[in-house]
Amino acid sequence: MSEIVNGRGSGIVLLCRAGFEGDCAAEIQDKTAELGVYGYCQTQPEQAYVTYHCQHEEAEHIARKLTLKDLVFAREMFALLGPVKVAGIEDRASEVIKVLKPHQETFGLAGELRVGTPDTNEANQLSKFCRKFSVPLRQALRKEELLSNKPLAKRPMLHVLFVNPAHALVGYSYSYNQTLHNGGIVRLRMSKEAPSRSTLKLDEAFQVFVPENEHEKRVHSGMKAVDLGAAPGGWTYQLVRRGMMVQAVDNGPMAESLMETGQVKHIQEDGFKFRPKRKNVTWLVCDMVEKPARVGELMTSWLLEGDCEEAIFNLKLPMRQRYAAVKGYLDQIKEQLQTEGTKPFEIQAKHLYHDREEITVHLRWLPRS
C-alpha cells in the first residue's frame, strides 16, 4: 500500500492505464521540472494511478498551470489534499469533510463532485458503491457549504478516488483543467456496422481533440477526408458516419458495406506514396503499423504541403522508455512545423482509453486571428 494512503500528504494524483504508471510518472516529473517544482513520484505496477508528492503550495501551482490536455499518459489529474481511511467507519462522508475543511480557502465553493476509482479490475468492483456513496456525500458537502446546491461548471470540482475499499484520496481540480469524463474514460459502444474495433480509437479521438462547441464547424458532412492504411475500414467508418467523402488508401480490401455508401473511393496504393490530386482535403487520418518517426514525418509533410488541414494518427509505442520515445517523436514534429511552416499550429497527443500500445496524435493549423 502506498505511503500516501497510510499518512498525510499533498501533491498531484494522476490516473492512467494500468501498466503505464512508469510512463505517467516520467512525464509528470519532466513537466513539473519545467515549472520549477521538484517532487517525487510513488506508484506500483498495474495500480493505474500515480501520486506525485510535493508541497501543498506547489500542488496548487501545478493544478493551475500544468494543463491536462498537454499530458500524454494522464487521463485525469487533481490536486491531492489528503488520504481518507474509511474501513470500519459508518459515517464516511464526515471523514472526507475532515480532509476538505482545512483547505476550503484553496478551492472555495466547489461546483461539482466526482467519486471514482482507478481503472483496474479490482477497483472497478467498487463502482456501484461509488455511485451510492455519492448521494449522501453530496448532501453532506452541501450542508457544510463545501459544494454548491446546483452543479456550477465554472467552479472547481471535488474528487474522491477510492483506491481500495478501505482508503480514498481526496482533492480538487479547476474547471478549466479537467476532463468531462469520470477517470478520463470515454466509454463508447461498438457499432455493428463498423468493420473493426479500431473504429473506437478515431471516434474517441474526435471527442477528445475537437471541443464539442467546434464540432459543427470542424467535423461535418460534405468534408473531404483521406484514410491512409484504411483496410478494412474501421477509421473510414467514422468519417463516413460523419457524412464525409473519403479516399481510402490501402492495397488491402475494404468492407463492402462502406463501399456501398457511395462516400468511399478505394485507392489501392502505398499510403506513403499517395497524395491527393486536389488541395481540398480537410481531414487526414492514419492508423498504419509503421515506425513512429516515419509516420510522424509523413503526417507533418501533408500539413506543410497543404494536402490537409487537420490530421489524426497513431504512433506505435516501444516496449520500454515510452515517455522518452514519445517526447522524441513529438519534438521532431514540432521542430519540422516550426522550421518549415509559416502558420501557427496545434499539436495534441493522448494515450486514449481505446489505445493499447500506441498513442493518438492530432495536428492542425490554427486559424489566423
Curated annotation (Swiss-Prot):
Pfam families in the record: FtsJ, RlmM_FDX, RLMM_N
NCBIfam families documented for this protein: PRK11760.1 (NF008734)
Record: residues binding S-adenosyl-L-methionine: 198, 231-234, 250, 270, 287
Transferase recorded as keyword: yes
Gene Ontology CC, one term: cytoplasm
Subcellular location(s) of the protein: Cytoplasm
GO MF terms, alphabetically ordered: S-adenosylmethionine-dependent methyltransferase activity
UniProt-recorded name of the protein: Ribosomal RNA large subunit methyltransferase M
HAMAP family for the chain: 23SrRNA_methyltr_M (MF_01551)
Keyword tags: Cytoplasm, Methyltransferase, rRNA processing, S-adenosyl-L-methionine, Transferase
Keyword Nucleus: no
Top-rank taxon, per record: Bacteria
UniProt function note: Catalyzes the 2'-O-methylation at nucleotide C2498 in 23S rRNA.
Family per record: Belongs to the class I-like SAM-binding methyltransferase superfamily. RNA methyltransferase RlmE family. RlmM subfamily.
Organism annotation: Idiomarina loihiensis (strain ATCC BAA-735 / DSM 15497 / L2-TR)
Broadest EC class assigned to this enzyme: transferase
Residues of the active site: 316
Reactions catalysed, as given in the entry: cytidine(2498) in 23S rRNA + S-adenosyl-L-methionine = 2'-O-methylcytidine(2498) in 23S rRNA + S-adenosyl-L-homocysteine + H(+)
EC number: 2.1.1.186
GO terms, biological process: methylation; rRNA processing
Quaternary context: Monomer.
